[in-house]
């Protein structure tokens, strides 16, 4: 099925080197389907409404590799009702291209001391009411409570599906949405840039 949904020879850009992948040399790419979860990046809350827009004809799927600062982007176009993979681009993250936030996030998830200094006091916390699963509970957490509640966050790479939402380099807010694959996991992390740099100011856990 994947070969049928791929345009061959497939343009593949390895940094500055343009290549072509013939159908006979294509290896099945699982993207993030073998992962436990995938992530999405947004600048604004309203942009999250773009997910699932059935009118879209173009979507890019990205892997952002935190250690190497590499970005692998898959370009999909919808033609005659079918999504087709039209190109893949592997390149270094450009200066300013979410680089500031990615640099912060990489340290935030790996350095607990740094993390504690970049959490809003108090931290807004939204979750499902344990006494009523149909109600949302809005409360706050202090740093110690955050460490008790915090989930495992991706540390090696982030995925992103670009539905047309803006990911501006100069945006002073970023939203990281982590969706589980077939397990009901759903966490959203809200970051903003203040005088001391980026901070986590809201955490939402609506996992089922």
Label each PLM-derived region with a short phrase.
Residues 8-70, 133-185:
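Surface-exposed, charged secondary-structure patches
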Residues 11, 73-74, 113, 124, ...:
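Intrinsically disordered, low-complexity N-terminal regions enriched in serine/proline/glycine
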Residues 12-14, 124-135, 195-200:
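Hydrophobic, well-ordered secondary-structure segments
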Residues 36, 40-42, 115-118, 156, ...:
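Generic marker of "main functional regions" within proteins
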Residues 62-96, 184-208:
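Short beta-strand edge/turn micro-motifs at domain boundaries
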Residues 79-117, 122-137:
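Surface-exposed beta-loop interaction hotspot
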């Amino acid at each position: 099925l994947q070969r049928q949904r791929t345009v061959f020879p497939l343009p593949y850009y390895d940094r500055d080197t343009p290549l072509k992948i013939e159908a006979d040399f294509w290896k099945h790419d699982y993207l993030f389907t073998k992962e436990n979860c995938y992530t999405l990046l947004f600048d604004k809350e309203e942009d999250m409404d773009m997910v699932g827009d059935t009118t879209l004809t173009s979507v890019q799927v990205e892997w952002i590799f935190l250690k190497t600062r590499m970005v692998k982007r898959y370009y999909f176009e919808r033609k005659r009702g079918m999504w087709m993979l039209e190109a893949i681009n592997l390149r270094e993250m450009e200066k300013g291209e979410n680089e500031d936030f990615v640099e912060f996030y990489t340290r935030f998830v790996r350095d607990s001391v740094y993390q504690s200094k970049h959490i809003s006091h108090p931290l807004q916390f939204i979750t499902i009411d344990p006494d009523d699963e149909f109600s949302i509970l809005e409360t706050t957490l202090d740093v110690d409570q955050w460490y008790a509640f915090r989930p495992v966050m991706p540390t090696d790479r982030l995925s992103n599906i670009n539905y047309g939402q803006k990911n501006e380099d100069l945006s002073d807010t970023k939203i990281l949405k982590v969706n589980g694959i077939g397990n009901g996991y759903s966490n959203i992390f809200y970051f903003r840039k203040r005088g001391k740099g980026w901070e986590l100011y809201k955490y939402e856990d609506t996992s089922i």
